[in-house]
């Protein structure tokens, strides 16, 4: 079973705790109590794989922003939540997303954009199109309008971010495997080149040895011929025509 840490981010009062508790416990929490930090765990199955989720429900108020960076560092996936009844809550997400990308030092971070409180149609100030536009501006980040009260798209939003985490891990694993195979091939090629070089050196050594032996034989024969010639010069032909040849 794989462990995944999901961080829920957003302005205060947008319903981060409500959708988290609804997802984990199946209960709607109506009262608003500003959260410092709550941690929840839930085991789910995504695409046939068992996952143990740790969900961090973070504070939305300004005095807890220092803690937020720690949550972002440890998180693998993020739900960025705004309220469709609060235009400023969507604007705050722009800065939050930039903070996530900066801390994670990546443009490829598992992330879902969530427009909560879609059941409050009479209080709505942000349309679905507003959320879609932000999603497009962020590179087609998955976007869901949710209702914590009616559990509309709550499970879908969490499962989506988990699925993104799984895909990213699979891609990283495949890349590492490919790099390992490439290194193995390079090592084999280097070993083959080294072996070929040694064979060439051995052949070159044998050729030099053979040439040296030939040179030594030729030098020996030259020396014998020189001695023979000297001996003939030292003992000229006799009057009877006999030859005296002394080979030393």
From Swiss-Prot:
Pfam families, per the entry: Ras
Signal sequence extent: none
Positions of the propeptide segment: 246-248
Summary of the function given for this chain in its UniProt record: Ras-related protein which binds GDP/GTP and possesses intrinsic GTPase activity. Involved in both yeast and hypha development. In the yeast phase, it is required for normal (polar) bud site selection and is involved in cell morphogenesis; in the yeast-mycelial transition it is involved in germ tube emergence; and in the development of the hyphae it is involved in cell elongation.
Domain of life according to the entry: Eukaryota
Cysteine methyl ester carried by residues: 245
The keyword GTP-binding is annotated on this UniProt entry: yes
Residue window of motif Effector region: 32-40
PROSITE patterns per UniProt: RAS
Composition-biased stretches (Low complexity): 184-214
Positions contributing to GTP binding: 10-17, 57-61, 116-119
EC number annotated for this UniProt entry: 3.6.5.2
Notes on activation and inhibition: Alternates between an inactive form bound to GDP and an active form bound to GTP. Activated by a guanine nucleotide-exchange factor (GEF) and inactivated by a GTPase-activating protein (GAP).
A GO term, aspect molecular function: G protein activity
Family: Belongs to the small GTPase superfamily. Ras family.
Compartments reported by the entry: Cell membrane
CDD domains, alphabetized: RSR1
Entry's Gene Ontology cellular component terms: cell division site; cellular bud neck; incipient cellular bud site; plasma membrane; vacuolar membrane
S-S bonds: none
Bias (Polar residues) ranges: 219-231, 238-248
Keywords noted in UniProt: Cell membrane, GTP-binding, Hydrolase, Lipoprotein, Membrane, Methylation, Nucleotide-binding, Prenylation
Protein name: Ras-related protein RSR1
């Amino acid at each position: 079973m794989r462990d995944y840490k999901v961080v829920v981010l957003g302005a205060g009062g947008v319903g981060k705790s409500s959708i988290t508790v609804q997802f984990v416990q199946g209960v709607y929490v109506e009262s608003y109590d500003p959260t410092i930090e709550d941690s929840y765990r839930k085991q789910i199955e995504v695409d046939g794989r068992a996952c143990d989720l740790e969900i961090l429900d973070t504070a939305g108020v300004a005095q807890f922003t220092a803690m937020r960076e720690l949550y972002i560092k440890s998180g693998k996936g993020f739900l960025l939540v705004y309220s469709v009844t609060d235009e400023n809550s969507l604007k705050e997400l722009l800065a939050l997303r930039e903070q996530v990308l900066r801390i994670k030092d990546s443009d490829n971070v598992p992330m879902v954009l969530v427009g909560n409180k879609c059941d409050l149609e009479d209080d709505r100030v942000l349309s679905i199109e507003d959320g879609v536009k932000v999603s497009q501006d962020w590179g087609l980040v998955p976007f869901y309008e949710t209702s914590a009260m009616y559990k509309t798209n709550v499970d879908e939003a969490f499962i989506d971010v988990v699925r993104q985490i799984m895909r990213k891990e699979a891609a990283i694993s495949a890349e590492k495997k490919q790099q390992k195979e490439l290194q193995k091939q390079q090592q084999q090629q280097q070993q083959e080149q080294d072996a070929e070089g040694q064979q060439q050196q051995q052949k070159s050594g044998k050729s030099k040895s053979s040439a040296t032996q030939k040179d030594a034989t030729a030098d020996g024969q030259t020396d014998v011929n020189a001695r023979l010639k000297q001996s003939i010069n030292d003992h000229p032909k006799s009057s009877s025509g006999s030859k005296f040849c002394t080979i030393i």
